[in-house]
């Protein structure tokens, strides 16, 4: 979730990284492997560790197109009822919060089997 200005800035940096030649998954891994809060400095350090210029990111993060991208993402999240991370969408179900991998896999398998993340006799047709 976006909790502070520093969190907004980290999201802006993530947008810029996603638009760069850097592998976004590498950025994500570096960012969430760091200790402490995900904030401006953590995002800048993660991007810089992948070869992006800290100065360029700081100069570009306030650009109107970055603000527009952030607003679009926020609008979509609001429309889907997402207020935090992580949130999973499986089928038409919104599942907030972290899930153990086994639970996530089971819910996906259930969706494939019965059309719901939790199968019941009626969901399975009998």
Residues covered by each model-derived region:
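Structural alpha/beta surface segment adjacent to cysteine/selenocysteine redox centers
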Residues: 1-48, 83, 114, 118-126
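C-terminal cap of thioredoxin/glutaredoxin-like
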Residues: 44-126
């Amino acid at each position: 979730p976006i909790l502070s200005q520093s969190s907004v800035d980290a999201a802006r940096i993530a947008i810029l990284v996603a638009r760069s030649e850097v592998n976004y998954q590498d950025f994500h891994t570096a960012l969430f492997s760091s200790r402490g809060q995900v904030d401006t400095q953590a995002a800048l350090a993660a991007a810089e560790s992948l070869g992006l210029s800290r100065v360029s990111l700081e100069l570009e993060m306030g650009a109107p197109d970055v603000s527009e991208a952030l607003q679009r993402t926020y609008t979509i999240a609001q429309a889907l009822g997402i207020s935090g991370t992580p949130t999973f969408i499986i089928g038409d179900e919104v599942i907030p919060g972290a899930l153990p991998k086994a639970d996530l896999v089971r819910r996906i398998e259930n969706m494939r089997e019965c059309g719901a993340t939790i199968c019941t006799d009626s969901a399975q047709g009998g």
